Every structure is written in C-alpha cells, then in structure tokens.
Amino acid sequence: MKSKLLRRAAATVLSAVVLGVSASSNLPSGISTKAAPDEYHDDWLHVNENAEVVDMNGNPVWMTGCNWFGYNAGRQVFDGVWSKNMHSMLNQIADHGFNLLRVPMSTQIILQWKNHGPDTGGGVGEVTMMVNPYENPELTVGGGVDGAGQYELKYSFDIWNMAVDWCRENGMKIMIDIHSATTAAMGHQKPLWYDDNFSEDDWLEALSWFAEYYKDDDTIIAIDLKNEPHGKPEEGTFAKWDDSHDKNNWKYAAERGAMACLEQNPNLLIMIEGIECYPDFEKGADWTTPCVDYAHYDEPSLVFGAWWGGNLRGVKDNPVDIGKFKSQIVYSPHDYGPLVWKQKWFYMDDPSKTFDRQSLLDDYWYDTWAYLVEEKQYPLLMGEWGGFIDAEHDPTGENKHWMQELRDYMIDKRIHHTFWCFNENSGDTGGLVYDDFGKWDEDKYAFVKEALWQTDSGMFIGLDHQTPLGQAGNGISLSDYYNGTVTPPVSRETSTTTYSTTTLTTSNTVTESTASSVVSTTSTPVISSTSSESSPEISEGLIGDANLDKKITVADAVAILQHLGNKDKYGLKEQGIKNADVYNPGDGVTAKDAYAIQLFDANQITELPYTE
C-alpha cells in the first residue's frame, strides 16, 4: 500500500510541476482542488456514440494485445518465471508491439491479496509459487540466492505490483480477467463465476477491491468480469442470458459485477463475455431445451451453440444495463479454430466444402457476435484467439486458414483483441514463445504482427499518452501518434451552436442538427436557449470547450492549465480562450476555470458558466 500512496502523491505533485500552475492557488471556496489529469489518470478509455473506444481527447484507439497466464493456475505469478526473468519478458512483449496485456486471475488470489493471506492457498485450490530466484533476484527479499543456497521470495502481491510498474515503464496497459473462482490450472472448465469455494458475493468483493486499489493507476485500464461463462441446460449447471434475476443469469451477474467495479473506478473499461448456448425462441425453444438433443440428433438444433463465452446473441434483446456507465462497456467474445474443436462451420468432415470470411459470417460470426460491431452497437474485443499454424500441428492448414480469416476481419473492422497466448504451455494452441519461454516463434509472431496497431512505417502505437511502447525504440506513445507527423483518422463533424449556457443532461438520446439521434448514457452537454446577461458575447463554439474538440471533458481543464503555465508552447486559440472563461465570465482565464470544468465533468456542478 505504501507504494500505491507514494504513486498517488507523486502524480498529484507532478501535474502541478509540469503545468507550472499551483494546484490550490486562487481557488474559490466552492471549488474542489481535484487535480487535472496527470500521468496516472490521463489514459482512461471510453466508448463514444459511434461504438469506438476513444481516449480522453476523443481519439479512437486500437487495443491489440496478448494473454499471459499463470496467476489463475496456482503459480502466484506468470508462467515462465520459473525459468526466465519476468522483467525481461514484459519488455519483450512490449517491444514486439503488444499494447495490452490480458492477465487471467482468480477470485481466490485477489481475495488472498485483499486479506493479506499466505501464498500457500490455505488448502484451497492448486497453489505452488514458482519463481526461479537465480533468474529473478529482484523478486527475492534479499536480492538473490545467498552462499548457502537460501533465498526468500517476495509476497506475490508485491511481485504483481512490480509487474504493474514494469508495464507502466513500457507504456503497456493491463486488463485482468477473472478466469475462475478457485485457483486451478483447469479452473476455467467450471461454467460459472462462482463455485463451491467462492460465492458470487466473493466474486463481487474481489472485483470491487481490485478496482478501488488501482483507481489511481491507469496502467490497469480494464477488467474482464469472467472468463468464458458456459454450460448446456442438459448439464444442470449452465450460464443463461435473459432479463431474469436467476442465479445463473450471466447478464444480470455482469451488471452487478460491472457496478462493483465502476462504483470504485468509473473510468475502467468493462469487458463482458458471452455464454455458450442460446435458445432459438422463434422455434419454441427455452432455457430447458437441450443444446445437444440425442433423441433428435439428426434434426436441426433448437439451440444456437458457440465457443465458451462466445455467444452474444442475448445482447440483441437484453443488453447489459448499467445506466450512465454504458460508455464503459466492451463486449468480448472468444473464437477458436478447428484444432480446438471441429465446429460445423469449418466443414472439416466435408471435403467438397471449405470456409471463408463470408461463410463464417453467415454460419456463425454475424448473429453470434459480429452484428454488434457491424451495426455499430458496441465495440468488441476478441479476448482470446489463436492456435498452431505450423505443419506439424496443422497439417491441413485449416487452422491457419481460420486464423487468417479472423485476423483480417478484425483488422478491417478494427476489432480490439488479445491473442492467446504468450505462454508456450497452452496445450491446444501453443504460444508466441518456446524453448522454456526462451525463444520467440518468429513465424507465428509475423502472422500476428499484421494485426498489431502500428504506423505505416512500422512503429507500434501504445495506449499511454506519455510513455512510448516498449524499450526497443520501435514504439510510440498515443500523443506521438496524434500530435506527431502521423496523420490521424479524419474526425467526424459535429454541429456547433451559438449559445450562452451549457447544461448537463443524463438523457439517453442526443439529437444533432447534422445527424439522426444516437444512443448514449454518458453525460452529454446540451445547449440551453436561456440567455445570461452577465455572460460575455461568445461566438460560434461550446462554452467550456477550451481545446476546441467540440466536447467538454477533463482534457479542457488540462488545456487551460497548460495555457496558463506556458502560453508560448500551449497557448489556447482565440475561440478556445473565449470558451474557457467559464468561472465568473469576464474575469479572464484562470485556474478556477479549469477546476469548474473538472467539476462539471464529474457531475458535481450541472451548468456552465459557473458564477458565484
């Protein structure tokens, strides 16, 4: 906890030093001294009305990462740390261009950390801490192995926080996923988010604590609530998706899990996976209909099957509802190839047929998950995809064929993804490395590299605004990309209106003069027709929009403070200066305006300009 508090303090001080503005000077009594976004708070991501994941400035981003497991499987650390240096491996992942690391965990290990429990598992789960102290002296209490061959490992939570710090220094973000309730190598085979050892309330407690602990560190930008909810009705225990409050209703549980996180940190992205089976209600099926009906085996199924966690058909009629936090939802299916299972859409038993993108869309992808991005309802992050592509494991080449179809589709649709996996010890897929985590599979990496976010010149783009991705000099920061020589995507035009007052609304519908209504539950500035005689004349623009990006966010507060700190370098444009004068209009631009905008963005005041 000491490290966490020091990071918070350092971040607050740094923001004032960098901007050259006192964090508390000349503040009115009614204005909070909440700091503008600093290096620990400027990388949070959100979803806009076009179903794009964007940064604080509204710029679209592309999360392209990989998985590295171990914490879920009982090692109390990443797999491979038993043979190689953890810091070095994290550097390698970032240097290879992965800007997001998905880390499978368990409810058990998070509650252990919360309660300062021992690294032995307490008799529950499969827990054996596996760290090579010779390769990882920094993970030992004494800095290595002594002359007598003795050493003491640091506590696993302290080691985890070292990993978080090393990801931060690499400009690489983290998403954890609750892979299972109980720590176990095969824990993911349990279908639900609770089991005999850990209840749903335990799961919610773990999510809440983790979100609160890291709320001031934007290295961890997302939480995947539960890995692969699944199960078939005929198996007795299964995940469903409807509008009920049934204990096995994943949609309802996901709403509770999301709120457990967002009530602690409203800036987290929440990844929500699907289920396995969804009834064909139009044909009379329900949640008691067997997914595999052996009594009618040769007849068309009345249940739509999918990969575990991959079935998002239920979102169409019953989307996850978390009110004003809708802007933090990203749906996250998983998809695999025929080497994991010979699904019917691969036509592996019919030599006269094969699959392609269109057949995959028609037979499986579109109605199962792709409609969400095709129809721009929600962004998608493919949380797991991958497999063997070498001739020994994939002699027909059909697994690589599937991987290429999915990879290219994700590139075309800018679907976010985390490749499965870095580990070499994933039995049915292999990994990006081999030789006991010592060498990279260059053929597989070259295949995946095509789907990593990079510039035309091959520079990998990170998700951190200040720190370039990796240590190898082949990565850039988000600010480098959007403020440098690289041409960003063309921004969409929005309407501008002459006005005198901006008011906060939580309405779900915003109507623009240039477009049809779009759905959003984020707080949205709308224009009031009420005039204010005390306000100065303002030309076309949006009051509070200091950086002229046509919206009001904490980025405007940052722009004001930078303007005050160094007008030559960060000076606002003339219209931006007019828009920025929101606190007692007519007094000119001061730090008070920045804090008023922060309060407005945090819903602590509901109207701009703000007057006393």
Which residues make up each language-model segment?
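Cellulosome-associated attachment modules in secreted, modular CAZymes
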Residues: 9-10, 20-31, 496-612
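Mature N-terminal, pre-catalytic/accessory segment of carbohydrate-active enzymes
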Residues: 8, 34-37
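Bacterial N-terminal signal peptides that target proteins for export
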Residues: 2-13
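Histidine-centered active-site/metal-ligand motif
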Residues: 179, 334, 563
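Extracellular glycoside hydrolase catalytic/binding regions
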Residues: 82, 194, 204-221, 226-413
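Substrate-binding cleft of secreted/luminal carbohydrate-active enzymes
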Residues: 356-358, 362-488
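Active-site/binding-pocket entry motifs
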Residues: 69-74, 336-339, 566, 603
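Active-site mouth of glycoside hydrolases
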Residues: 38-286, 290, 298, 308, ...
